[in-house]
Structure formats: C-alpha cells, structure tokens
C-alpha cells in the first residue's frame, strides 16, 4: 500500500513524547491482537486458486509467515496528542460537540486537521518501517536455520497494508469523481495484487 510510504508526513507535527515512545519499539510486535505466525499452505485451504497464484501462493506445503503489528506507542501517542488538541479546539474554534470524546475531530482544512494528518502519515510510515525490520529479522532467522540465502529460500514480501489510517482518495459519489478523506479504523483497503 502506498509503496510503503505515506506522502504528506511531517515530523514537525509529531510530539517529542510520541518520538520517545517509538524509539525503542522498532522491530517489535507489541501485545494484544498483534502476532507473528508461521503457516503452511494446504491445497484444501486455498479458496481462490487464481488469486492465490497472483500473490505467489500456489505450492501446497509452501511456508508463509504472517504478522500483524503497527507503529506501536508512537502511533498511539500521536492519536492521543491530537485527540486532546481536537477536544480543546472543537467547541470554541469549530462549534462542534460530540457525545463521546473518542470521536473528537477537526475539519481537515484546519491547522489542527492538517497537522494531525501529517503526524498520522508519520505513524503510518513508522508502521511500514517496523514491519520491514520484523520481516528482515524473520528472514535472518530462516537463513540461519536453513543455511541458505534469502534468494535461495525464495523469501519475499507478499502484501503490506496499514490500518487505522486516513487517506486522501478519489471516489465516484453521485455520478461525480471527488477527492475524499477516507478514515479506516481497524480496517484496511482491499487492493488487488
């Protein structure tokens, strides 16, 4: 997704606290729903052979490593910082109120909205970097265990996608193409191979 780099990232929009939280977490999974699994491709577990083949997943017995993690404390702190910023600005500056403080927001065109988007892009990029480091560490272990190179083992990334992001996208709405800010909380965009 986004070739591993969200455009629009601006480190100046990220607090020192967020940076400090992320410094020693690069290359780590975290807890909760984050995981790393070593899986075996079974012929009876492939539901769409054409699609699986497009991703290079076609050999029964093929070993696949799947993992899920993000930007860790860095992204969490970015969200926390801007949630508080939005809560302060909403009533007076934007005339907005929400029933749940977790829904705090700011207009995208506002300084607060633009700063949040720039910081969120930094968090998305941190998540790409984190997963890249984890992938490298997994590859090193496989190479050491099997005594073969990455190329000999056929190790490669199949798919990398972020969740909990907002992206500027073009979509058709009421017969007209429009640029929209699409927020996906705990969800990802389904992109073709």
Predicted regions and their residues:
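Domain-length cofactor-binding catalytic modules of enzymes
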Residues: 1-193
């Amino acid at each position: 997704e986004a070739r591993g780099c969200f455009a629009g990232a601006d480190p100046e929009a990220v607090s020192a606290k967020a940076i400090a939280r992320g410094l020693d977490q690069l290359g780590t999974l975290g807890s909760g729903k984050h995981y790393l699994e070593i899986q075996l491709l079974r012929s009876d577990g492939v539901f769409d052979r054409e699609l699986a083949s497009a991703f290079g997943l076609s050999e029964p017995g093929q070993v696949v490593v799947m993992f899920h993690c993000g930007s860790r404390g860095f992204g969490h702190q970015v969200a926390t910082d801007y949630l508080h910023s939005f809560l302060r600005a909403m009533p007076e500056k934007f005339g907005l109120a929400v029933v749940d403080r977790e829904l705090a927001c700011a207009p995208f065109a506002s300084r607060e909205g633009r700063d949040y988007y720039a910081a969120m892009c930094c968090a998305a990029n941190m998540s790409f970097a984190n997963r890249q480091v984890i992938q490298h560490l997994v590859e090193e272990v496989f190479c050491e265990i099997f005594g073969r190179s990455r190329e000999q083992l056929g190790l490669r990334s199949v798919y990398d996608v972020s969740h909990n992001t907002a992206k500027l996208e073009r979509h058709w709405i009421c017969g007209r193409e429009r640029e929209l800010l699409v927020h996906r909380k705990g969800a990802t965009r389904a992109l073709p191979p």
